[in-house]
Amino acid sequence: MKPAARRRARECAVQALYSWQLSKNDIADVELQFLSEQDVKDVDIAYFRELLSGVAVNAASLDALMAPFLSRQLEELGQVERAVLRIALFELSKRDDVPYKVAINEAIELAKTFGAEDSHKFVNGVLDKVAPTVRKRK
């Protein structure tokens, strides 16, 4: 699968996770609704599904990984930033095939696309601190 298809999977995952975090609906329902309403022809659907289910199942442990490195309480974290950080930490902790730098760079790009004005700086700062505790730099 092309790298662009993975990037699109991450972009879609941010949007679907944002919806899930706000709605508290079942992740399978969020996935079905998202796939029925969005244009996903250039998306690595299998990877999108893995990110979505993987983050949902591991949300508490992913939050616990990032919490010590946040400059504010986890509850005060913006929903976009939380979704982006959860995806990056899922990739770093569960997907050894995703290079360390790729996971971080993709998260920064996602934050630039979907986050507030300086959220990419915040995401970069958090991941710069937490990532080495999750996986060795390669």
Swiss-Prot record:
Q: Which UniProt keywords apply?
A: RNA-binding, Transcription, Transcription antitermination, Transcription regulation
Pfam families with a match to the protein in the record = NusB
Keyword Transcription regulation belongs to the record: yes
CDD domains (UniProt xref): Terminator_NusB
Any GO molecular function: RNA binding
Which top-rank group of organisms is this from? Bacteria
User: Transcription among the record's keywords?
Assistant: yes
A single GO CC term, please? cytosol
GO terms in the biological process aspect are: DNA-templated transcription termination; transcription antitermination
List the InterPro entries hit by this protein, alphabetically: NusB-like_sf, NusB_fam, NusB_RsmB_TIM44
User: Belongs to which family?
Assistant: Belongs to the NusB family.
Protein function: Involved in transcription antitermination. Required for transcription of ribosomal RNA (rRNA) genes. Binds specifically to the boxA antiterminator sequence of the ribosomal RNA (rrn) operons.
Q: What is this protein called?
A: Transcription antitermination protein NusB
**What organism does the UniProt record list as the source?**
Yersinia pestis
Q: What's the encoding gene here?
A: nusB
